[in-house]
Amino acid sequence: MMNIDYSQFFHMLPEVTLTAVLVIVFIADLFSAAKPAESKPRKWFNPLVCILMLIHILINIFPVPAYETFGGMYATSHAIGVIKTILAFGTLIVFIQAREWLHSPDTCFKEGEFYILALSTLLGMNMMVSANHFLLFFLGLEMASVPMACLVAFDKYRHNSAEAGAKFILKATFSSGVMLFGISFLYGATGTLYFEDMMTRITATPLAIMGMVFFFSGLGFKISLVPFHFWTADTYQGAPTTVTGYLSVVSKGAAAFALCAILIKVFGSMALYWKYLLMVVIVMSITIANLFAIHQKDLKRFMAFSSISQAGYIMLAVIGDSAMGVTALTYYILVYVVANLAVFTIISSVEEHNGGNVKMDAYNGLYQTNPRLSFIMTIALFSLGGIPPFAGMFSKFFVFMAAANGAQITNTIGAWTYAVVFIALVNTVISLYYYLLIVKAMFIKHNDKPLPTFNAGINTKMALAVCTLGIAIFGVCSYVYDWIYAAVAM
């Protein structure tokens, strides 16, 4: 009989507490849910879930020291603890603002399922970022992808949600196959699936290079990098707005951090190859997404291309290939979480009070009837565009500095790195144009039938307050960046 050392689970505290939250939510839903025809909103259920998530965050806000367990397959560190806290924080914001949507007649009978699926997705992401072995990494990735597909198709009778779910499943299946193909090549080249062992054995052979390219391509689908982005706009448009917000920040942030860690851990000796590949993908992602975003008329499709562009900026930090680069990437994800979720919270609120309309024209003259929402939307868009003094400007600055620092360290591709940074700066200016199109619509354009004045729900106000404070404080308070840098440097 195999003896299990249960003390190992102490080093998996984020997963243990998250599993406890998941079990409590499941039991509470099981014993309180009514039949769909008789179902009424449970006013106590959302506060319970949010309080449990807050407790989970507070327990894990001080990351545990670096440690490997379960035969070296699972690894934790201060940096991994920070990214898990950020992902849980983003999930909490989504849960807060989801209350109004989940209490509608079409969804109130499956409120519990939403929380269970979202928590399962978060648990898979936690396993993915802590993986020190490709098997555990793949299991975590699929554990996150399957519940996410259910969330995308959650509102299957409205807004093309079923179509979006089908496209997401096809994308997930194809990308997983491509990734497994690459992992099999890497195993053939090194004879191991452990990250650290693979790092010492891997050399730039054709088999290893092909494995790296296939693995990068598979994960590129998850992050929505060009040219692996074709599913993004349709999925974002068809999924429920709350789910779209969750998919755009939490899922993307986890995959981006995991890719950064694997490129540095496993492919450190092949940095010259993956940096060239990454630079091409970054330029395409930022440029093509910006050009497509300018012509969008649907706000959720617009945010899809904005998300693709933001993914390019996030990957720019990976070129730094240092503690500064990982810090910039993590800080960018944190700022992106609060700014993007603020936008999607407003989109969800306007959609709810405007008959499901998410077209750009619906925001014409919004300032006249709903000035507070217009003001918060402007702050969030300015942060996404990198306009000072908001946090988005500092996140882009740190990303550019990390990439430039990487260029100084690596003379071989230094000139190319500076060129990519310059192109990213030019695209930042271009992105201001299409973000300001929404601001122009809200404050300047006239609307013969403007959206009536409405009072947003208390949960929407709470979510927007948290996001707005984050946009303001994360930029002004240097402690946040210092906290992340200290965790990464340990």
Regions inferred by a protein language model and the residue ranges of each:
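Alpha-helical transmembrane segments of multi-pass membrane proteins predominantly involved
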Residues: 1-490
